[in-house]
């Protein structure tokens, strides 16, 4: 299956383009999809995007079997409307995959269906690394905050993954100490719940850190600009 990856950023709260690409590439690799092109957009996607040459080349190429998006929210119009607009210039149906949402839009007639969340293996390794970092006294908030953004895109995206894998995350937390070495812990249910809640609360603190960092970077870029006072 030949596919095109579509990434887009519409606000500071969106996962970075690079993170979206990483997740989509992992998804394609898992399903043995052949990536033939990657499209980067700024802003949400609608029918107007289809008017650009980059999109026309993809849509009119019947050798392209599917588009791989990071999430459904990248599209500002109905997925069905976007599909119909694309099909006006195609003779062969095209599928759409949404990696983070574990959804696919295809079939005859086309409709949404659930898919397996194939980024779990990637996320699990990164979550293990994150837990080790958080247990290291030498790692400050800035290092951990940057790790979260670089590997998960946002704190909200990370929390979504964690909340859908509570049992596994809790077992990793309870089997790791400050040096990342496995230890025996109590099987007490309350201890397990407390450990998970404490971990989640720590992660929530990085929401503020992320926004402050982004605003600082934005202010820095503005200060670098040459502002001409036109009279």
From Swiss-Prot:
Induction: Expressed in the early phase of the viral replicative cycle. Pfam families: Pox_F16 (PF04708). The keyword Acyltransferase does not apply. One of its GO terms (cellular component) is host cell nucleolus. It is found in: Host nucleus, Host nucleolus. InterPro entries: Poxvirus_F16. Keywords: Early protein, Host nucleus. Its main location: host cell. Belongs to the orthopoxvirus OPG058 family. This is Protein OPG061. It comes from Variola virus (isolate Human/India/Ind3/1967) (VARV). The lineage of its organism: Viruses, Varidnaviria, Bamfordvirae, Nucleocytoviricota, Pokkesviricetes. The gene is OPG061.
